[in-house]
């Protein structure tokens, strides 16, 4: 089971009912935060998921509406009692940005580990950038006015132990547990590997987050078969497409086009322009292309369960 909360859905500037952009993913006691705009920790306090277990913060890019909540959040994490290292991932320039944002708070009771990614826009996938237990984070360069990344968070599901397979392979009972945990074991001068006792691969969970970009073809494959695709819809109106092209953003129908091409299960629109006071008025522009589209809102929550297999 994986929990997702859209902490903030505003773009550019906060409004009376929208914090700036941020997405929180929680799985098995671990939390991943993508972007940290103003108001992030306010929403976190309201949903009461806790701060101490935030292990990774991923930045898409370094425009102010995506990073200005970091300083306060790091201080709150410190006050929560965290002492384990915290990892921050982002495009090139991460060290300079974090250094600037923490001038007023230079000391924390935990180490901050920084991972800077090559984020020149291209059609090539970046390799897996981070792994924590069963959760893997991937990144893809997209097309904004500055270097920007899209992120995909994938939860791998453990394969079931297959007793019949273990017996057929004549695996000694006393090493079953270690093989089930993924270890290779040499026993009585013979090598035993996990594949000798484990069943078929099982479908995991995939969440893809994309904001501040024009549509790029590589997103179709990157977001392919996502259980949830959280994508920017800066403007709802079709007539705003020219502005979206100029500002390197998307309109609702373009986000829906990516969702359809990627065959995702569900699309949440987010990162709305402050001028877009009623995004639901333009929802049909997206639903005509991809039916299972929803308007994002601050503190919108979804629980995704593994399929029964």
Swiss-Prot record:
Protein name per its UniProtKB record: Ribonuclease Z
Chain residues that bind Zn(2+) 1: 61, 63, 144, 212
UniProt keywords, alphabetically: Endonuclease, Hydrolase, Metal-binding, Nuclease, tRNA processing, Zinc
Main function: Zinc phosphodiesterase, which displays some tRNA 3'-processing endonuclease activity. Probably involved in tRNA maturation, by removing a 3'-trailer from precursor tRNA.
Source organism superkingdom: Bacteria
Organism: Clostridium acetobutylicum (strain ATCC 824 / DSM 792 / JCM 1419 / IAM 19013 / LMG 5710 / NBRC 13948 / NRRL B-527 / VKM B-1787 / 2291 / W)
Active site: 65
Named cofactor requirement(s): Zn(2+)
Gene3D superfamilies: Ribonuclease Z/Hydroxyacylglutathione hydrolase-like
UniProt family annotation: Belongs to the RNase Z family.
Catalytic activity field: Endonucleolytic cleavage of RNA, removing extra 3' nucleotides from tRNA precursor, generating 3' termini of tRNAs. A 3'-hydroxy group is left at the tRNA terminus and a 5'-phosphoryl group is left at the trailer molecule
Complex and partners: Homodimer.
Residues annotated to bind Zn(2+) 2: 65-66, 212, 271
Cofactor note text: Binds 2 Zn(2+) ions.
GO MF assignments: 3'-tRNA processing endoribonuclease activity; zinc ion binding
Known EC number: 3.1.26.11
